[in-house]
Amino acid sequence: MQVRFHKMHGLGNDFVVIDARATAPVEMTAARARALADRKTGVGCDQLILLEPSAVADARMRIFNADGSEVEACGNATRCVVSLLGGSARIETVAGLLEGRSADGQVSVELGEPRFDWDAIPLAYAMDTRAMPVAWEELEAPMAANVGNPHVVFFVPETDAVALDRLGPRIETDPLFPARINVNVATVDDRANIRLRVWERGVGLTDACGTGACATAVSAIRAGLVDSPVRVTLPGGPLTIDWAPGRPIVMTGPATHVFTAETDLSAFGADSRG
């Protein structure tokens, strides 16, 4: 089956976007998503995004990590899809309905209200998500938030001093997190600026993670460390996060279209039906 796809990125967090709203249905398996995401033998991406018809929105967005796992939300991908759909769109996801709009070269997306209850993260057992009584070497007492997908946030003196490539996979797969977890290490520079690095569940170290920026910002606001809006700078560049309790998170940042091409999906594995 020949399909058209778009290569896009948000601050270096890159995607293969397949728009199947007006085509024959595209079957996306974990194996096929892994093959397409492979940077040596596939197209290459952090996440594969499949757009399908929706009865309640402009599109239904499904998100597959590079390891083939299907996940609930991706902030950078949402901005890219809003841009692809013309700059104003309502998008159906597993995490809920998201709305976005673009202006002055930036895309803003409402990502819903964060959740902080331990069972909404989810955690394996009850604890205070404002200062979890756990540690992995020098990383200790994280905060936790679910912003459509699960995150822990460690506030540290210097993000670059943390061996996130080593500690990230340990924390991601710890039994405390039954759905695995995205791992954020953040340094608060002042009340308007945070620096952030992210180990993304199912992906690894990434140049940018929109939901990670959101989880970190709302955690810092919750702890009284910063004001809103706050600028969160990742290795790929900055995002602006605006949030107050009782309101949805609004994330603003760029979305870049790199190229459009076609590929034969049969080269990346057979459909499950044969």
Curated annotation (Swiss-Prot):
PROSITE patterns: DAP_EPIMERASE. It catalyses: (2S,6S)-2,6-diaminopimelate = meso-2,6-diaminopimelate. Pathway: Amino-acid biosynthesis; L-lysine biosynthesis via DAP pathway; DL-2,6-diaminopimelate from LL-2,6-diaminopimelate: step 1/1. Substrate binds at N13, Q47, N65, G75, N76, N149, N182, E200, R201, G210, T211. Keywords: Amino-acid biosynthesis, Cytoplasm, Isomerase, Lysine biosynthesis. SUPFAM superfamilies: Diaminopimelate epimerase-like (SSF54506). It comes from the Bacteria. GO terms for biological process: lysine biosynthetic process via diaminopimelate. Coiled coil: none annotated. The active site is at C74, C209. One of its GO terms (molecular function) is diaminopimelate epimerase activity. Homodimer. Belongs to the diaminopimelate epimerase family. This is Diaminopimelate epimerase. It comes from Rhizorhabdus wittichii (strain DSM 6014 / CCUG 31198 / JCM 15750 / NBRC 105917 / EY 4224 / RW1). The gene is dapF.
